[in-house]
């Protein structure tokens, strides 16, 4: 149905509901509009969105391949906007249409999407389409059982690639998350898993993503699955190759007197993490200020579309301008955070080589 409510009305409604300690949701005001009036206002060019007509009573019942029957009261489902005022569809509408047109048979997603199930079921019914099978997987957890987030462990797959993990080991480890092979073995290929995969063997308990266990498994692959020649080839493909070393050498050369100087200067570019030498920081900031600036830099760097030395440097120059600081006042903190030392290769160019995930 068309909804003509202004942003002011919606904001006032939200404020009133929050003041009454109610869950903010649309009240279905425009659902009661006479169809002729709705058509007339649309024809006159009045701005509107298209919202999902959700039943007011009863509950949505749908089947999950892992959880069997899921029941959610319609009163808990909001009137989702399906098409924005500019004519573009929102995620929920686009998702259902795309899945249907691509003949998707199984929708496999995280359990945080369970509450969106009724919206999608309602859309499939509205279109007269047979919905796919739904599988809502348990979310990965940190060792302390908290929800997996990059604040505690890196979550980008590119981080583990750049840090030197084998793709086979990462796939193997992810395959172990909430799933076990019938013979209980821990080292297996994706082909092995494909041959025996059965959704009924997936555990609903929150699987723990433990980096130390991943490292242990990766070590087994290095020692048991690869020959010496394979290892040399993989090391070369990873970072010990002319292309990667060729990027570092121009930065290191002005600081080299012997070949043995190269290792200490460039070692951070081959490490997943660095040992922090806080004593080497000159012009120290207060810890709270340093933490705030590091977080600010992280947010700003995440916006970069071009990960090169100059754009990276521009980010730090903007931070210096906003904070009314000189670069020399806070850059030592970032030198140590990235390289582990207050003396190293030119930082912006080194970060460009290191990549966004490890940086």
Model-based region annotation:
Residues 6-136, 141-150, 156, 181, ...:
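Active-site cores that bind ATP or allylic diphosphates and position pyrophosphate for catalysis
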Residues 115, 127-133, 137-276, 339-359:
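Catalytic adenosine-cofactor/nucleotide-binding cores of aminoacyl-tRNA synthetases and other
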Residues 90-93, 143, 187, 320, ...:
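N-proximal short alpha-helices
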Residues 1-51, 237, 242-247, 263-359:
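Basic, alpha-helical terminal appendages of large translation-related enzymes
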Residues 110, 160, 204, 320, ...:
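Short, charged/polar micro-motifs that form catalytic or ligand-binding hotspots
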């Amino acid at each position: 149905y068309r909804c003509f409510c202004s942003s002011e009305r919606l904001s006032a409604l939200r404020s009133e509901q929050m003041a009454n300690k109610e869950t903010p949701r649309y009240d279905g005001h425009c659902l009661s509009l006479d169809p002729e009036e709705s058509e007339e206002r649309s024809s006159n060019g009045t701005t509107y969105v298209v919202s999902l007509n959700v039943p007011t009573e009863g509950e949505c019942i749908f089947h999950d391949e892992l959880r069997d029957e899921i029941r959610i009261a319609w009163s808990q489902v909001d009137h989702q906007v399906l098409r924005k005022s500019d004519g573009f569809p929102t995620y929920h509408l686009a998702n259902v249409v795309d899945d249907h047109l691509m003949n998707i048979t199984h929708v496999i997603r995280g359990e945080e999407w369970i509450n969106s199930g009724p919206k999608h079921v309602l859309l499939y019914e509205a279109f007269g389409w047979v919905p796919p099978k739904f599988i809502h997987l348990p979310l990965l957890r940190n060792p302390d059982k908290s929800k997996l987030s990059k604040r505690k462990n890196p979550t980008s797959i590119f981080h583990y690639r750049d840090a030197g993990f084998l793709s086979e080991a990462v796939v193997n480890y992810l395959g172990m998350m909430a799933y076990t092979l019938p013979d209980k073995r821990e080292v297996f290929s994706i082909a092995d898993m494909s041959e025996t995969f059965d959704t009924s063997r997936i555990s609903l308990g929150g699987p723990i993503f433990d980096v130390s266990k991943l490292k242990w498994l990766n070590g087994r692959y290095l020692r048991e699955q690869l020959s010496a020649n394979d290892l040399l080839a993989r090391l070369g493909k990873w970072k010990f190759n002319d292309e990667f070393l060729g990027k570092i050498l121009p930065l290191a050369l002005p600081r080299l007197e012997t070949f043995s100087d190269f290792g200490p200067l460039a070692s951070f570019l081959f490490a997943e993490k660095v040992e922090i030498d806080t004593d080497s920081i000159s012009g120290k900031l207060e810890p709270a200020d340093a933490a705030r600036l590091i977080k600010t830099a992280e947010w700003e760097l995440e916006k970069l579309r071009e990960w090169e030395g100059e754009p990276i440097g521009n980010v730090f120059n903007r931070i210096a301008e906003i904070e009314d600081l000189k670069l020399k006042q806070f850059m030592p903190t970032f030198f140590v955070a990235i390289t582990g030392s207050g003396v190293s290769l030119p930082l912006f160019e080194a970060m460009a080589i290191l990549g966004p995930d490890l940086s």
